[in-house]
């Protein structure tokens, strides 16, 4: 009986990590709508990183990744979708923040936090890695200096 329960729990845990992206409609900074279940990177892994303009750890993480992003792209082809959860009254702060930091990510807006809530995410930064088949293979909440190295290692492992 214990073995059956353990097997069920392990199967459930694996299925949570290998889930597909939910269908939520977000907007680009130019106002175009995009459904999250259509996000892709031409069969290569991609990262979804939830942030807010007021979140200092989020900004530190995205700055740290920005320093190595071009190298990551050349090596692995990885793409990053940075998803702002700033509420409607703060959305106008996103574009200047992105511009001031020189982030080259595809920026998406989730002012109601619906996309983040779909993952039961409450704390940001909240980061997902999605494999080339569109399956979520990694989830992480929070940021400590140097944690971006773990992200690229996980992406590299997907390409082996």
What is the predicted role of each segment?
Residues 97-103, 111-154:
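Thiol/disulfide oxidoreductase modules built on the thioredoxin-like
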Residues 43-46, 50-54, 123:
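Short pre-active-site segment immediately N-terminal to redox-active cysteine/selenocysteine motifs
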Residues 19-20, 32:
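Boundary of Sec targeting at the N-terminus
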Residues 60-100, 114-115:
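Structural microenvironment flanking redox-active thiols in thiol-disulfide oxidoreductases
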Residues 4-13:
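Sec-dependent N-terminal signal peptides
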Residues 46-48, 81-83, 128:
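Conserved hydrophobic packing residues within short motifs/helices of P-loop NTPase cores
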Residues 25-46:
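A short beta-strand-turn-helix
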